[in-house]
Amino acid sequence: MSATTPTVKPTTGPLSTALVAGVGLLLAMDVAGAIISLSAGLSPTLLDALGPQARLSAPIPMMIAQVLLVAGATRRRRGVAVPASALLAVTGVLAFMSGFYDGGYAADLTAGQRVFQIALVTAHLGVGVLAGFRLVRLLRR
């Protein structure tokens, strides 16, 4: 007889897949935004472009939090998935709101940079909405 430890696997439903893809897109956009910011002279270093004063990307701690939260939100265990989904939904709203408080929306950006910023914030809100749908689905089980 061998004892096996249960493993917690992520769910493979379309909503979970969309959440993982959405956070993957956010990470790619964050890195691209940091490179754009660096090449345009908005930030002196790559770490500054990914720091608290970033205009075209999320700060590194937010990116790490989103990866951890999507890992939790896509788990089958409700005890993990419910709070992770709720927090991931909140991060979408925080990403949007932070631009009003940190001067990100008032920054002097070119039209292309502004379009990228709008696309990034929209993607953050989209992931937040997906996380909200995941939360509702979990709470209805």
Segments and roles (model prediction):
Residues G22-M63:
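Hydrophobic transmembrane helix segments
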Residues L19, A107-R140:
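Alpha-helical membrane-associated segments of multi-pass integral membrane proteins
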